[in-house]
Design a protein with these regions (language model features):
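Intrinsic disorder/low-structure terminal segments
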Residues: 12, 78-79, 128, 138
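ATP-binding pocket architecture of kinase catalytic cores
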Residues: 13-37, 43-121
């Protein structure tokens, strides 16, 4: 989780909103690597959007740079970053076909805009985060140990996962065999109900 605060500033003409975030350096042990990735990806997308003649303002996040022109600051050994504000909303579930449509549109647009982006330039900030076979093995170990005695409360869910164990490596196998390309992933929807950023 990233700790977030909303802030705003006024000039003589309008109020400008920002989102100030403390990067959780327990989860993201290399905040510098995270910000390196964010900057590479957002700049690549911004340049593609401009090249395609579209409005770039809400097409990607806009980092607010420090006085030293950095994309983050360190205060009391904590890493902070700032973006211009984009109104947002997260959907945990939905039955609205428009929300499904916009989610698919966002994923497709994101992948389109990152066409040609070289993922080997990125840093791997959470080791094995998308390594589903590794995640499944960890899951099995935790269920087996059950040191908090909770497995009995979720037998149905555990069986659901176990029945799908043979599918856990479909993507990692395809990546290893170069049948599919390695891609950048990130999912984010905004309050306007349309894929925007």
């Amino acid at each position: 989780e990233i700790n977030t605060d909303n802030i705003s500033a006024k000039d003589e003409f309008k109020e400008i909103k920002y989102i100030l975030q403390k990067i959780n350096d327990y989860v993201f042990q290399s905040p510098i690597g995270v910000m390196y990735n964010v900057e590479l990806i957002t700049e690549y997308i911004r340049n593609r959007v401009i090249y395609e003649g579209e409005n770039y303002r809400n097409a990607t996040l806009t980092l607010v740079r420090s006085k030293l022109n950095q994309n983050f600051v360190i205060v009391n050994d904590e890493y902070w970053r700032c973006y211009t504000w984009i109104d947002g909303k997260t959907y945990e579930t939905t039955s609205d076909p428009e929300v499904f449509y916009e989610a698919g549109k966002a994923v497709g647009k994101f992948q389109h805009l990152l066409e040609g982006f070289h993922t080997r330039c990125l840093t791997d900030n959470i080791k094995n985060f998308h390594n589903t076979p590794y995640r499944y093995e960890t899951f099995r170990d935790v269920v087996k140990i059950d040191d908090l005695d909770r497995a009995s409360e979720c037998k149905k869910e555990i069986e659901f996962i176990k029945k799908r164990a043979n599918k856990m490596s479909v993507i990692t196998d395809a990546l290893a065999e170069k049948r599919i390309p390695r891609r950048v992933v990130h999912n984010d929807t905004k309050q306007i109900g349309r894929a925007s950023c």
